[in-house]
């Protein structure tokens, strides 16, 4: 605990909050172009082939983003919308691709949580 004199001499440092998604540059989403679409394996206790894409954003950053849902139509040069949100078992993946926006199609045959996967209401 500092004394009053110590506080007069040197004031307290302000705590700076570090962004969890710096590549979005204070925007809710960013548009980008897929440069590589591939699968990768998760960290130790889990086992799968997770679908990810390397995306060059309009902000100039190149990020790895996760493609959620079953099946996708993305390939190189696809235009996608990227939002924040990390994948806990994939190191370095801090972004999600928004399904149902731009070139990323919605998940077909989805009946629950449709809004998260860009699926229209079934007739």
Swiss-Prot record:
One of its GO terms (molecular function) is rRNA binding. Pfam families: Ribosom_S12_S23. Gene3D superfamilies: Nucleic acid-binding proteins. It comes from the Bacteria. GO terms for cellular component: small ribosomal subunit. PROSITE patterns: RIBOSOMAL_S12. Keywords: Methylation, Ribonucleoprotein, Ribosomal protein, RNA-binding, rRNA-binding, tRNA-binding. The modification 3-methylthioaspartic acid is found at residue 89. Residues 10-20 have a biased composition (Basic residues). Coiled coil: none annotated. The keyword GTP-binding does not apply. Residues 1-24 are annotated as: Disordered. The keyword Translocase does not apply. GO terms for biological process: translation. With S4 and S5 plays an important role in translational accuracy. Belongs to the universal ribosomal protein uS12 family. Part of the 30S ribosomal subunit. Contacts proteins S8 and S17. May interact with IF1 in the 30S initiation complex. This is Small ribosomal subunit protein uS12. It comes from Sulfurovum sp. (strain NBC37-1). The lineage of its organism: Bacteria, Pseudomonadati, Campylobacterota, Epsilonproteobacteria, Campylobacterales. The gene is rpsL.
């Amino acid at each position: 605990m500092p004394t009053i004199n110590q506080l007069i001499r040197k004031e307290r440092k302000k705590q700076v909050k570090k962004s969890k998604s710096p590549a979005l540059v204070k925007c809710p989403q960013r548009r980008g172009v897929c440069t590589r679409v591939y699968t990768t394996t998760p960290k130790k206790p889990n086992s799968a082939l997770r679908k990810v894409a390397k995306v060059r954003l309009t902000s100039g950053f190149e990020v790895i983003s996760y493609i959620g849902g079953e099946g996708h139509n993305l390939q190189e040069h696809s235009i996608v919308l990227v939002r924040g949100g990390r994948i806990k078992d994939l190191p370095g993946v801090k972004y999600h691709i928004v399904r149902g926006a731009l070139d990323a199609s919605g998940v077909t045959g989805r009946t629950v949580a449709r809004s998260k996967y860009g699926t229209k209401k079934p007739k």
